[in-house]
Amino acid sequence: MTGDRSGLEPSLVKDLRRTNLAHLLAISGLHMGLLVSVMLLAVRTLCLLLPVFITRLYAKKIAAFVALCTAAVYLGLSGGSISTQRAFVMVAVMLVAVLFDRRAISLRSVALAAAILLLLRPEALFSPGFQMSFAATTALVVAFLWWKDSAFQSRRKAVNWVLGVFLSSFVAGIATAPYAAYHFNLFSHVSLPANMLSVPLMGILVMPCAVLSFVLMPFGLEAFGLFGVRLGLEWIAKVALYFSGFSNATSEIVTPQPWVLPVLSLSVLVLFIWRGRFKWMSLVGISSVLLGWSTAQRPAVLIDQDAALVGILTKEGRALSKERGAGFIAEVWGQNDGLLLNHDEAFGLWQSVNMTVKHHWSKKNHGGPVHCTAEEIHVTRLRHAISGDCIIFDKAYLSAIGAIAIWFGEDGRISRIAHAKPPTVKKLCTPRKSGRYKNSQ
């Protein structure tokens, strides 16, 4: 209830991520929205039961004010993480709109919340949480504004509730899927059924019982509310365990070019918000994104900035130059490639590929002379005497310039080299004391 996840088992966290239920862990828009909804319903019902006419007249505004205060208190209790701050701003804009007799759920409210957050934290624009939150919120607002006036609604409230749950889970999943694939290189095939079986329970059981436990806490009776919370969370854990057990529950997605996500976001916004024939031009942008993502080319060679690991891309996955060590880097490379292998398998590929890339990291041959040819790339963590016409990257040079990615052309020659630390004016004007990138021809 306060965002503390230290007691969770790593296996459970992994199951939640594979089923796209990890958003239930962080205090974000879902939790804040459910809390505010519970408070709005409870306070407004209480006001309507009171015999005072003026209280009934302003029941909606009183409930909105109490819900706003509750959200502010919850923000403080949870520690005020960035995701919680973002959620608070979003619900605060909605509740203030209610206080001033404005429409609470609208695209203007979403835009205002985004503007406030970007004024407070401009760097949030590039964070996955900000992008996914506002993608889901914008999509849900557009979907429910359409649903409100559509002919698909039933006269039965129960049927509309079920359809609403399905629609919200489907729309939010579709809206956040490209951002999750871009940032986390993972697409969950079981996200929709897992969320449909879990998210409604958060609103029906977990959050109301959590609010009840807070109310009963001063009297030492919070166990009654926490019992319902435990039942709901146990159900969610079982759902995550069941769906994550499928062999094809997830797929690794290759990282596309940086322009893909901005073009996709702008194109979708134009398609669903713009009025007029011009909006159909956004389909060109969406088509280019799909083409660019499907033809994304990963680097043939990746070199760690400490010269501790080298990876060569093969059809089976990325071959790694060491049997162990630099595990986090190897995992990130595999996720970005969309072909995640364990370290032993990746090292086995290194033994079988016909390599023009050599990695000198073992101290057994420390300082020994090495001769190279023009077709080879040598990466050395140690002080080797390397002679020849090859390209050499040593530890000192990599520490200064950052990790390196290399692409080859159709003729087998290097077509592009990119590094993690682009040279600044200061770096260009300051002579390098040690390290080398040598290409003697």
Please report, for each region that a protein language model flagged, where it lies by residue.
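Internal transmembrane alpha-helical bundles of multi-pass membrane proteins
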Residues: 76, 80-264
